[in-house]
Each structure stands twice: as C-alpha cells, then as structure tokens.
C-alpha cells in the first residue's frame, strides 16, 4: 500500500511540475522506504531543479539603419573576394587594361612591392663550445650550454673553429683554423626542457622521480672572419692529389 501511494504521489508531482520524462528520479528528494512514510512527498530543492534543461534564448541582431543600407550595398561583395580598384578609385575613373604600363603604375602606387632581400654571405663554420661541436651560419641562432658571466646583448668571439666552408673552397683546421673567429651576440639566458630522472631499487621500496632543467644560452651568429689567410683545400686539388697517389701506387706495383 505504501509503495502504491508513493508511485501515485510521484506521478502527480511530475504532472504538476511538468518534468521531462527522461529526468533521473534520483534528483528528487524522495524519502527512503526504510523511514516511516507519511504520505506526503517533499518538493524538490531549487538546486535540483536548476539541473533541468532550459530552452536557450535566441539573440536577435540589430538591423542596419535605413540611411546606412545604401552605403553598405555599394561596398558589399561576394565572400572570399579580394578588394578591387573600383572600391578605391572614383566611379568616373577609367581603369586601364591589365598588363599595360599604366595599370602596373597604379598597382605599384597602391601596393608597393618589397625590395629584394639583402644578399647573405654563403659561408658556414664548425665551432667548439663547451666540448660540443656546432654548425653555425651567419644570421641564425643556436642554443649552447650556459656561458658563465655572459649577459644579454653581450658580444662574444669563439676562437675554436674546426672548419670553415664557402661556396668556392673549404678551410680544414689541423686541429683548428688559425686566426679564424666566429662573432656572436647573447640573446637570452634560460633553462632547457625538464628532464625526468627516475631511480628505482628492486625489493627495497625505493623510487625517486626527480626533475632537472639544464641552464642554456641562446646566441645569434653575426659573422665569420679571419680564415682568408689559411690555406684552402679545394675539390680539384683533392682530386688531383688522389689521382697522383693512385698513379704512384700503380707504378710501385708494376715489376721492374
């Protein structure tokens, strides 16, 4: 009898509140059957009713005023279309045909072309910084180990140059290129990405998960100088030396 009264009360409550059919009945504050039932169901709390779906209100945009509609229609164009000369020039202006010098002059006037980029020196070098070797090119930047005592915008000179390469020749050091220097500027002092060091001992309940960030320095290469007086080794000279060595080896192999 108590269960029938509870079902009737719940159905009448849902009909009164007009709750959706897919609503979870656990959201309602229904007293458990283990307690004495008085026949009256307590109304749901406001926090439970706040979970009910609410119809979203549509926002209406304000219409364009009548005095601005004419100007808006003049500049209205299909989507994804580039601006035309007619949007800038007056209506009575007669635009020249595309491809003519007059048309190009107008295009250059409104859309000036960028000048050619400055010529870049085609040269690279291999330099040693902190027991590591780096390939450096003027105009580019690299990350190295922390340079102690260096601050931002400091100019530095790297003297341990192992090799210098140009478009015409190559300068190979023995072990370094004499008087060669790489000029750079310190841009930033920062920390590298975090490295996780995990330590584990079997059957000892010992685990350590410690992180570490290595200090590094970012430098920008500005130039490579001082290699001109060093003897260069070209590809043709290497080929000739190789041919001479092969000829001498063949001459020694021929019996007298």
UniProtKB/Swiss-Prot annotation:
Alphabetic keyword roster:
Chloroplast, Plastid, Ribonucleoprotein, Ribosomal protein, RNA-binding, rRNA-binding, Transit peptide
Query: Which terms does the UniProt entry file under GO BP?
Result: translation
What is the protein's major site of localization? plastid
What does the subunit section of this Swiss-Prot or TrEMBL entry state? Component of the chloroplast large ribosomal subunit (LSU). Mature 70S chloroplast ribosomes of higher plants consist of a small (30S) and a large (50S) subunit. The 30S small subunit contains 1 molecule of ribosomal RNA (16S rRNA) and 24 different proteins. The 50S large subunit contains 3 rRNA molecules (23S, 5S and 4.5S rRNA) and 33 different proteins.
Q: What does this protein do?
A: Component of the chloroplast ribosome (chloro-ribosome), a dedicated translation machinery responsible for the synthesis of chloroplast genome-encoded proteins, including proteins of the transcription and translation machinery and components of the photosynthetic apparatus.
* Pfam families membership: Ribosomal_L21p (PF00829)
- Asked if the Swiss-Prot or TrEMBL record annotates the protein with the keyword Cell membrane, the reply is no
Transit peptide start-stop:
1-55
In terms of PANTHER family, this protein maps to: 50S RIBOSOMAL PROTEIN L21, LARGE RIBOSOMAL SUBUNIT PROTEIN BL21C
**Which range is the signal sequence, renumbered to this chain?**
none
Entry's family note: Belongs to the bacterial ribosomal protein bL21 family.
What name has this protein been given in UniProt?
Answer: Large ribosomal subunit protein bL21c
Does the keyword Chloroplast belong to this entry?
yes
A Gene Ontology cellular-component term: ribosome
Any idea where this protein resides?
Plastid, Chloroplast
Q: Name one GO molecular function term.
A: structural constituent of ribosome
């Amino acid at each position: 009898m108590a269960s029938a009264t509870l079902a009737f009360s719940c159905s009448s409550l849902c009909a009164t509140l007009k709750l959706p059919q897919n609503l979870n009945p656990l959201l309602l504050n229904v007293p458990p059957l283990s307690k004495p039932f008085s026949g009256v169901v307590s109304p749901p709390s406001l926090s439970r009713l706040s979970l009910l779906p609410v119809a979203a209100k549509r926002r209406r945009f304000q219409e364009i005023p009548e005095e601005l509609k004419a100007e808006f229609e003049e500049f209205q164009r299909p989507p994804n279309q580039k601006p035309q000369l007619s949007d800038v020039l007056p209506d009575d202006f007669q635009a020249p045909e595309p491809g003519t010098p007059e048309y190009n002059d107008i295009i250059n006037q409104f859309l000036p072309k960028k000048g050619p980029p400055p010529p870049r020196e085609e040269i690279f070098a291999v330099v040693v910084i902190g027991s590591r070797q780096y390939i450096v090119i003027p105009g580019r930047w690299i990350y190295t180990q922390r340079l102690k005592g260096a601050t931002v915008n400091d100019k530095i000179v790297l003297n341990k140059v192992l090799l210098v390469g140009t478009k015409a020749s190559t300068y190979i050091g023995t072990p370094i290129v004499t008087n060669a220097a790489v000029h750079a500027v310190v841009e930033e002092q920062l920390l590298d990405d975090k490295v996780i060091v995990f330590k584990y001992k079997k059957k000892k309940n010992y685990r350590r998960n410690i992180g570490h960030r290595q200090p590094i320095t970012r430098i920008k290469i500005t130039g490579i100088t001082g290699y001109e007086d060093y003897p260069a080794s070209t590809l043709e000279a290497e080929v000739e030396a190789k041919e001479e060595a092969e000829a001498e080896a063949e001459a020694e192999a021929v019996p007298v």
